[in-house]
Amino acid sequence: MNIEIIRAEMRREDEKNYVGNTVFRAEGEKSVYEITFMSKNGKDWDYSLHFTEQSGDEEELLRMDELLENDDDMYNQLLDAALDAYPA
C-alpha cells in the first residue's frame, strides 16, 4: 500500500526516552492518521495510532492498525520518517 508522509518528528525526553510521530495518509483511505512512536532505548518501539484531523470510523482505524501489525515495510517506512526527522 502506498502512503503519503505529511510530516514527521522525533525528539528525546529526559535524555533516555524517544518520542516521535508521523502523520500520513494511506492510498484509498479517507482519513489522515498519526502514529506516535515511543522507545526507552531507540531500538525497541511501541506505537499508538489515532486519527489526526477528526474522529473517523473505528473499523477503519482497526483495519489500519492490523495492517501496521502485519506489514513491516509500511511500519518501518513510518518509523524511518520519524527517525530521519531527529536532529543529529
Regions found by a protein language model. Give the residues of each.
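Short, charged/polar N-terminal "headpieces" of proteins
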Residues: M1-V32
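Acidic, low-complexity intrinsically disordered segments
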Residues: T36-A88
